[in-house]
């Protein structure tokens, strides 16, 4: 579980850099990319889930509770966190977005304390305080009189923090009854359908170059499909709090690659 969550964080950090390149340098629209990457990732994961479990992947539709759970997980978690992350990157950069995303540990800790009566341990408190200090330095650069990032980035960052918490908490109950691949696949498909309604694939189509195509393929199959498969699988083995804490590999990866590539 620890390895799965750590690898997911690393791949997400790499995907953040690919997103920054596509959105800021190549002006690919966030809405177009969301629909395409989620739909193709969903088909990839559904194919894998069917290979592993066959017709069992359709058992989720026998329970209204499970259907509702997948829809909520998609909108408020899996799809929501990808969209708010992309918008935060669009208004700032991958490093800023991933650092803000780590603050999702705060609502997860409060949720665990209230619902499961699990108070944070010393390591969790240290991680929480460090995340808060880091976020404050990021947003203000140590000054009480000015913001170092745009207001749009802060607003989307708040939604990013909340959807990251949803991404960690909402699938836990579903994973008690269903395969992680199946849950990820259906939630991804719901998100893809929603964003195709918002922004159909034939509108604002980018001009494809080898660099754009390679970044898109990486973002779709590694940064989305594989990353979410690993993260949701980790939730089957470790707690949501532990998985979210291990997501700190994401900002470290993004910051390092951002420095090496864009500086």
Task: Label the model's feature ranges.
Residues 26-80, 107, 111, 163-170, ...:
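Transmembrane alpha-helices of multi-pass small-molecule transport proteins
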Residues 2-6, 63-72, 120-132, 153, ...:
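Cytoplasmic-side transmembrane-helix entry/capping segments in multi-pass membrane proteins
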Residues 50-95, 101, 137, 220-238:
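Specific transmembrane alpha-helical segments of multi-pass solute transporters/efflux pumps
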Residues 1-35, 146-173, 193:
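Glycine-/small-residue-enriched transmembrane alpha-helix faces in small-molecule transporters
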Residues 22, 33, 88, 114-120, ...:
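Hydrophobic/aromatic residues within transmembrane alpha-helices
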Residues 45, 111, 120-142, 195, ...:
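Hydrophobic transmembrane alpha-helices of multi-pass small-molecule transport proteins
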Residues 9, 36, 78, 82, ...:
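Helix-helix packing/entry segments at the starts of transmembrane helices
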Residues 17-30, 56-60, 87-90, 139-152, ...:
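Membrane-interface helix termini and inter-helical loops of multi-pass transporters
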């Amino acid at each position: 579980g620890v390895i799965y969550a750590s690898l997911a964080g690393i791949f997400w950090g790499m995907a953040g850099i690919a997103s920054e390149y596509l959105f800021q340098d190549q002006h690919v629209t966030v809405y177009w990319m969301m629909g395409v990457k989620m739909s193709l990732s969903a088909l990839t994961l559904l194919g894998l889930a069917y290979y592993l479990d066959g017709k069992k992947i359709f058992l989720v539709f026998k329970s209204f509770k499970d259907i509702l759970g997948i829809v909520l997980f998609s909108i408020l978690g899996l799809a929501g966190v990808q969209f708010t992350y992309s918008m935060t990157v669009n208004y700032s950069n991958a490093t800023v977005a991933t650092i803000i995303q780590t603050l999702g540990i705060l609502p997860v800790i409060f949720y665990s304390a209230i619902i499961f009566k699990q108070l944070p341990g010393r390591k969790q408190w240290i991680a929480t305080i460090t995340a808060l200090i880091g976020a404050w330095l990021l947003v203000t650069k140590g000054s009480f009189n000015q913001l170092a990032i745009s207001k749009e980035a802060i607003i989307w960052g708040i939604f990013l923090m909340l959807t990251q918490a949803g991404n960690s908490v909402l699938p836990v109950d579903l994973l008690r009854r269903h395969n992680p691949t199946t849950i990820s696949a259906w939630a991804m498909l719901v998100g893809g359908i929603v964003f195709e309604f918002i922004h159909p694939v034939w509108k604002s189509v980018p001009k494809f170059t080898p660099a754009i195509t390679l970044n898109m393929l990486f973002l779709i199959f590694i940064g989305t499909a594989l990353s979410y498969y690993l993260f949701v699988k980790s939730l089957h083995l470790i707690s949501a709090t532990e998985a979210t804490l291990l997501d700190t590999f994401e900002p470290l990866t993004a910051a390092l690659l951002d420095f090496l590539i864009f500086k």
